[in-house]
Amino acid sequence: KIIEVITAQDLEAKKGQNLANVLSQVAGVEINGNQSFSGKNLGYYIRGGRNRQVAIYIDGVPVTDASGINLEYDLRLIPVEQIEKIEVMKGASSTLYGTGAATGVINITLKKSVKKEISGNAYINMGTQNTSETSKTSAQDFNQGVSLNGTINKVSYMTTLNSTETKGMSEAAGEDFEEDTFSRVNVLQKIGFKANDQLSFEFFGNYDRIKNTFDNSFDGFIANSDDLNN
């Protein structure tokens, strides 16, 4: 069994990348689809096992995505800026994590609240894939967010708001199709209460709102422009 650790300092050098991009650079880990258009399903492969054999934990809590048919969690949903550490365990880990960890575990630790009453930061990332050279669109990516955290007496808190917009390009053939745009709003909140040195409580919540557009799927079907863009 091999454990590889990605620290906050490592993530600092990878600004502008999503979590799927970061993990795909780990030896022995393949994230199928991490370079595809936003909103596409991802495939996680560790030592030959795929999604259902790879467990994903955030602060020790197993996560799934109820919006998908297979309940698999999309690693692009969590902002990299809010991650303190990632542990990638390569190898069978069912004894510790159950049957969902037959070939590996991705264990994500979020940043903790600072000791002062309030602290915050804001960020914005912009980029392009230079697709304007071959297409009428430049497929710009915009990612921005703000975070507030602190500790007041025995209560700690962290609240982050992140939004992502991608002016994607159409996967359909032809020139009459609009870009397949993608937008996401993410709100992440942690609240902790330290009763004493031996007892503490922590509550974690995550909300995502996603809007994704796609083209008509009929090949060779002639329709009006409104139908083509729905």
Which residues make up each language-model segment?
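N-terminal periplasmic "start-of-domain" segments of outer-membrane beta-barrel proteins
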Residues: 1-14, 43
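Outer-membrane beta-barrel translocator/receptor signature
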Residues: 81-84, 95-107, 112-172, 180-187, ...
